């Protein structure tokens, strides 16, 4: 990114902002994918970014002078400070209804917020779960699995334990997938812990999407934000692919996804 420039210009009154009201869940996925791709390219070459006032929450308002809330997608993401979700998905104010929690876990309070979006925001066409690489919450769950003595400090902190416990199923699932793909000797690899964090993040993100789609009865997508590439995507049998995927429909589909991803990770 060295040497690249980014110029920001306020456009003022230049007409109405572009219409971003997708008709379907797939249209919403396309908008998120294009926004993610644009963010990934940010800084790679000189870029001029023109901001319409509506992009920051200023624009046509109701009679009371306040914008109506009309997001096209509701997103559950991690609270990691390195992943500002509207920016990473290339979206502006009033385009995403965002719920953030460490580990992007589907606890009752988070699901309640998403239930609100489903019931009261008809503009929402898609629900999405976004995890990210090197997630601290997932790493804590991995360490608790590989080194049970480290769980003792977590066990005495009820709220933190609730988050970590929510991630353990995905960690165990990912660990079994790695052993299936690479054999029992995989645990001796110096890269095993890092690969387990990577795969557990995918497993938990996909599992959360499956759970939410069943819970809400609405289309749900998922993806993992890769910090090194500044892009949301999904790991497949041949590596990381930019772009969201729709939630697995059943346990067989998520098992196939995680097993394929496990085989793509070198140990």
Give each language-model segment a name.
Residues 129:
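Conserved functional hotspot residues or short segments at active or partner-binding sites
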Residues 79-100:
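Catalytic core of membrane glycerolipid acyltransferases/transacylases, capturing the structured
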Residues 84-86, 113-116:
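Short, hydrophobic/aromatic alpha-helical segments in well-folded domains
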Residues 1-68, 93-94, 103-112, 119-124, ...:
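Divalent-metal-activated hydrolytic enzyme cores
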Residues 70-72:
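Glycine/small-residue-rich phosphate/adenosyl-binding loop
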């Amino acid at each position: 990114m060295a040497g690249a420039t980014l110029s920001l210009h306020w456009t003022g009154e230049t007409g109405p902002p572009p219409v971003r009201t997708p008709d379907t869940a797939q249209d919403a996925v396309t908008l998120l994918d294009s926004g993610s791709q644009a963010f990934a390219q940010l800084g790679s070459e000189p870029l001029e970014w023109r901001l319409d006032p509506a992009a920051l929450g200023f624009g046509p308002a109701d009679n009371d002078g306040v914008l109506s809330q009309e997001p096209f997608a509701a997103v559950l993401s991690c609270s990691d400070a390195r992943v500002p979700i509207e920016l990473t998905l290339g979206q502006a104010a009033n385009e995403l209804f965002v719920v953030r929690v460490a580990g992007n876990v589907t606890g009752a309070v988070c699901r309640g917020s998403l239930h609100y979006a489903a019931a009261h925001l008809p503009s929402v066409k898609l629900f999405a779960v976004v995890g990210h690489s090197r997630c601290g919450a997932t790493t804590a769950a991995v360490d608790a699995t590989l080194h049970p003595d480290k769980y003792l400090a977590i066990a005495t902190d009820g709220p933190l334990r609730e988050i970590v416990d929510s991630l353990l199923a995905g960690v165990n699932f990912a660990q079994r997938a790695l052993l299936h793909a690479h054999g029992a000797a995989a645990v001796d690899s110096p890269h095993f812990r890092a690969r387990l964090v990577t795969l557990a993040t995918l497993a938990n993100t996909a599992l959360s999407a499956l759970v939410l789609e069943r819970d809400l009865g609405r289309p749900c997508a998922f993806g993992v934000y890769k910090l090194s590439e500044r892009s949301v995507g999904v790991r497949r049998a041949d590596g990381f692919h930019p772009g969201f995927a729709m939630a697995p429909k059943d346990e067989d589909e998520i098992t196939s996804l995680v097993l394929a991803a496990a085989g793509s990770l070198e140990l």
